[in-house]
Amino acid sequence: MSNQAALKLVGKEDGDKQRALEAALAQIDRAFGKGSVMKLGEKGKVEMESISTGSLGLDIALGIGGLPKGRVIEIYGPESSGKTTLALHVVAECQKAGGTAAFVDAEHALDPGYAFKLGVNLDNLLVSQPDNGEQALEITDTLVRSGAVDIVVIDSVAALTPKAEIEGEMGDSLPGLQARLMSQALRKLTASINKANTIVIFINQIRHKIGVMYGSPETTTGGNALKFYASVRLDIRRTGSIKNRDEIVGNNVRVKVVKNKVAPPFREVEFDIMYGEGISKLGEIIDLGVKAGIIDKAGSWFSYNSQRIGQGRDNVREFLKVNKDLAAEIEAAVRKSSQKIEEELLVGGPEDGDDE
């Protein structure tokens, strides 16, 4: 009763309200731990921690220099668009910064050789190949709650098959089972993800809705829960092929930030993914350098500081591969011009209504 008495307002004076608020906060701190409730501006502006995506352009497009820590991220797109490649680049960047990464391989399709080529330290990568969706999400929950893992990648949502479906007959109809599993798991995971400051990346596939006449017929698997819980949603698409004479050596890729709770969304960036190499950093430096006006492009010729550095983008890339100091100088100039580039990357809003 004494606690209730302390909280009771005896008048409408500001002093009485302030004392009542302080008593309430003290009671909450005793019950749930210090810092359970705090004033947002109490410690000044808190900078959002992030981990680089491995793509300079995407880091700029995200507005905070990478993917935000302590948040749920969704990377989705068609088959062979670069979803897993992008996720592995984030893992590599996390490890370079001294972090611990885990990969929940629900598809049982992780290629260790390819991951190594992208810069992933295989000796320190935690890998799980679960038998069903419940097991995959329980493993994720345990890793996050440990507070010792900086990033968990789940590849993919479509492969998180509920146990009831695996144990049932091949033709059994079990509508909404996976959606309920995802909804329940995300309700449980979200608070611990934020508390542990862990990034959890869900890789997702695209399906087509039947009979849609208006709007986009595309949707992602696993129901709507992930769309709501994700702080960042990245739509990745292959836009073309990179050829060396008749041989295809890579893909042109476009990534659109369709949802961003930590910075302005709807920014779009393009980069190259080279086979056996991953995201082409030099290709990005050239493209972003041109966007920022750091590199001059006249016809097929590229110039930096009034000196020609090559004819054709591929030749410039080879030139910068040899001249690493010059490449580093241009990259530093691009990073300084990130605000100008951000404005260049802004595109229209969502094309359909399922991004909340």
UniProtKB/Swiss-Prot annotation:
Transmembrane segments: none annotated. Coiled coil: none annotated. It is found in: Cytoplasm. Its main location: cytoplasm. InterPro entries: AAA+_ATPase, DNA_recomb/repair_RecA, DNA_recomb/repair_RecA_CS, P-loop_NTPase, RecA-like_C, RecA-like_N, RecA_ATP-bd, RecA_C_sf. GO terms for biological process: DNA recombination; DNA repair; SOS response. Keywords: ATP-binding, Cytoplasm, DNA damage, DNA recombination, DNA repair, DNA-binding, Nucleotide-binding, SOS response. Pfam families: RecA, RecA_C. Belongs to the RecA family. HAMAP family: RecA. Can catalyze the hydrolysis of ATP in the presence of single-stranded DNA, the ATP-dependent uptake of single-stranded DNA by duplex DNA, and the ATP-dependent hybridization of homologous single-stranded DNAs. It interacts with LexA causing its activation and leading to its autocatalytic cleavage. This is Protein RecA. It comes from Caulobacter sp. (strain K31). The lineage of its organism: Bacteria, Pseudomonadati, Pseudomonadota, Alphaproteobacteria, Caulobacterales.
